[in-house]
Amino acid sequence: MDAELYRTSGQMIKLSDALIWFRNRELDALGLTSSQFEVVRYLLLHIGEEVTAGVLMRELGLSQSTVAGILKRLCDKCIIDRRQDESDTRRSFVRLTPKGLALEEELQGIALRSEDVLLRGMTEAEAADFYRLLSLALSNMNSVRDEAREA
């Protein structure tokens, strides 16, 4: 087996695991997980918009069952609530509760600490290149995923 063939994806998996571990450790005091953080972050960035489970699935790249579980746990913690769409009772909108909105400052602090650790030792130019390359790699992988969904 040629280790060079697996180097990039192996490093990406290790980086993802390390980042999730770091964020879960930081989020433990709030009773949240990294996946729950992503949903709350998305809702904080889209206050006033009609966000559904389907939107969260699409925008966060998560499965229906994963989103359903996250939303149930966030509802149980009174961080979000769900309001049924009056024109389509099969659909519900998700929004942050006052308790969820109150998490914004703490979550921003965790995001900044994560970013600081992730970019430690990089110059501003290297950090910008790193972000640009990560965005390109993610776009490449998302295009393959989107093509598979359409097939």
Predicted regions and their residues:
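C-terminal regulatory/oligomerization modules of transcriptional regulators
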Residues: M1, A125-A151
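Short, locally clustered residues in the helix-turn-helix/winged-helix DNA-binding domain
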Residues: I13, R41-G48, Q108, S135
